[in-house]
Amino acid sequence: IVACLVGSEMCIRDSGISNAKDASALTALGLHALQHRGQEGCGIVSFDGEKYYSEKRFGLVGDNFNKEKVLNNLKGDYAIGHNRYSTTGNNTLRNIQPFFADTNAGGIGVAHNGNLTNSIYLRNKLVEDGAIFYTTSDTETIVQLIAKSKRSKTIDKVVDAIFQIQGGYALVMLTQTSLIGVRLSLIHI
């Protein structure tokens, strides 16, 4: 998982921090450095202060996200990215992260590494309550839990979702106002 925040001149790549001028291009570079973590596909979600942009592709970062493509298609000073190595879900374009959703509190991009041990239970419960799933990835369960939360603020929706999931995981989320990082149940904004 790679996240870049240019609004405050920071780029977060797992535990590293550096200056950034183009969030999406720097995210692509970070994904390239982490290519060994997943080679099935890659994706980036960016935000320009008004609109979210998303690009997802099968294959390696260097084959899909050259600087020109990134700059043309992924505008904005905020970005998150993900290299896919599937542990759950089929190897389809739909399952490549980050995922993006509009909620009643605004848009959110979500990238996740790990395994949710209760994802089947949660997914079945969400479907019984009327949720429609687009992917076979357990990450979408997290997105659905965030969207379903009755809380009004995005961070509160995230907290609600985190308290429902079990397993080993790390998440990075991009909202209209912040980047949110979560490891197990520790939340960092």
Regions found by a protein language model. Name each.
Residues 50-77:
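Structured interaction and signal-relay segments at domain junctions
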Residues 37, 117-175:
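Short histidine
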Residues 12, 95-118, 158-187:
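Conserved catalytic micro-motifs used in adenylation/nucleotidyl-transfer and phosphoryl/amide-
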Residues 83-94:
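Glycine-rich oxoanion-binding loops at beta->alpha junctions
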Residues 1-9, 188:
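Single conserved hydrophobic/aromatic residue that forms the stacking wall/gate
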Residues 8-59:
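Extreme N-terminus nucleophile/cap motif
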Residues 19-21, 46-51, 103-104, 128, ...:
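Short acidic-glycine loop/turn motifs at beta-strand connectors
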Residues 58, 86, 125, 140-141, ...:
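Acidic, glycine-enriched active-site microenvironments
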